[in-house]
Amino acid sequence: MARVKNGIVHVARRKRILKKTKGFWGTKKSNYKKAKDTLRKGMMYATRDRKTRKRDLRSLWIVRISAALTGMGINYSRFFEGLRKLNIKLNRKILSNLAIEDIESFKKIVYEIKN
């Protein structure tokens, strides 16, 4: 029986892993064994952090809205209660952008809620 060395597949597999680890630091980009482990760990972090990014952004929006409301004499919970009562359908992301970029529109919304 002939010996099968599997050379082309072997090289292609290593090349694929090393291509994905381009930009990593030290031997983690050039040593196949370390590159493979680092890449696997990086993919795990990427999967986990796609979930946490959503939580982080939501909390950032809440902090921004709260910060904008403190100078206007209303707190966050009263603000959102007023939004629901007036049936204003703006989400936290939009409100956060309004509070930063278009403060006059945000003040008008707060004025409507207060009165």
From Swiss-Prot:
Annotated CDD domains: Ribosomal_L20 (cd07026)
Keywords, in A-Z order: Ribonucleoprotein, Ribosomal protein, RNA-binding, rRNA-binding
Gene Ontology molecular function: rRNA binding; structural constituent of ribosome
Gene3D superfamilies membership: 6.10.160.10, Ribosomal protein L20
GO biological process: ribosomal large subunit assembly; translation
Cellular component aspect of the GO annotation: ribonucleoprotein complex; ribosome
Function: Binds directly to 23S ribosomal RNA and is necessary for the in vitro assembly process of the 50S ribosomal subunit. It is not involved in the protein synthesizing functions of that subunit.
UniProt similarity note: Belongs to the bacterial ribosomal protein bL20 family.
HAMAP family tied to this protein: Ribosomal_bL20 (MF_00382)
Protein name: Large ribosomal subunit protein bL20
Taxonomic lineage from the root: Bacteria, Pseudomonadati, Spirochaetota, Spirochaetia, Spirochaetales
